[in-house]
């Protein structure tokens, strides 16, 4: 009887741990929807995507979207072609503070990621967001990880 109770308890704990882990497989992100799905797979709550009409809307040749992942703002731009995305990425300075002739005074060290026709900017310090973007988008092409790592 005790053995049965222990097995049931272990099964319940396992199911609970899997359900709460939020550690689903993170697929590569190459669109707004797949970016949101990747962040959700990591256990983050995603607010509605909205067109970026704020101060940073003129950074690239497309306005892009703002999305909030568990309170962290992420800017994403999806370009019409890979060539356009590559041209726009080439405008970003290695430290991420300059884009072409524009200088942005970010509140944290910005991190830039590119996967195909999509460029994502994260100006925050939450490691879960940075790690998820790294997994979904690939290595940073500009900027630094939080803490300069």
Task: Locate predicted features.
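Bacterial N-terminal signal peptides that target proteins for export
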Residues: 1-6
